[in-house]
Amino acid sequence: MSRIGKRPIALPAKVEVQIEGQQISVKGPKGELSRSLPPLIAVHQEAQTLKVSRVNESRPARQLHGLCRTLVANMVDGVSRGFERRLELVGVGYRASTQGNKLILNVGYSHPVEIPFPPGIQIAVEGNNVIVVSGIDKELVGNTAARIRAVRPPEPYKGKGIRYVGEQVRRKAGKSGKAKK
């Protein structure tokens, strides 16, 4: 039995779950998410908990069990509390701002980089150098934050670039060079 898959998912007070075959919909104060589950996985609602089980003991069913339980738990978490990723810009003159549904980054290129954000994602800029990506879909929040970071990942010599708040950047020593005469 999957150690993660066998744990029940607690449903908060204001969260409603609808299960129709392999389609599961979760509705809460922050919004609504739905996902289609593989045919090897079944979800049952018991009072204020959800149980994820597998249909048989085949290897693919065992592989998907813990994954599907975590995906459903993230849906419940997202519609009740939401998710957030914070990024910081490190570098002289690096700035971020929002304009409509676009994030505009000035990160040392000859032009500002515009990143449209998908529906269901909110992006806020704190100060000029902290970007907050939030939403109810954990996967979408993480992918959007990764796309922003990929514009200018931190470089190992000076540490300039876009990084997650709290991320440790491995630094390298520069060239030592020979002594000048």
UniProtKB/Swiss-Prot annotation:
Keyword Thylakoid listed? The answer is no
Q: Which residues form a coiled coil?
A: none
Q: Which GO terms describe its cellular component?
A: cytosolic large ribosomal subunit
Oligomeric form and interacting partners: Part of the 50S ribosomal subunit.
Please identify the protein, giving its name as recorded: Large ribosomal subunit protein uL6
Cross-referenced InterPro entries: Ribosomal_uL6-like, Ribosomal_uL6-like_a/b-dom_sf, Ribosomal_uL6_a/b-dom, Ribosomal_uL6_bac-type, Ribosomal_uL6_CS
Q: What is stated as this protein's family in its record?
A: Belongs to the universal ribosomal protein uL6 family.
Q: Which UniProt key words apply to this protein?
A: Ribonucleoprotein, Ribosomal protein, RNA-binding, rRNA-binding
List GO molecular-function terms, semicolon-separated. rRNA binding; structural constituent of ribosome
Q: Which PROSITE patterns match?
A: RIBOSOMAL_L6_1 (PS00525)
Species of the source: Synechococcus sp. (strain JA-3-3Ab)
Question: What is this protein's function per UniProt?
Answer: This protein binds to the 23S rRNA, and is important in its secondary structure. It is located near the subunit interface in the base of the L7/L12 stalk, and near the tRNA binding site of the peptidyltransferase center.
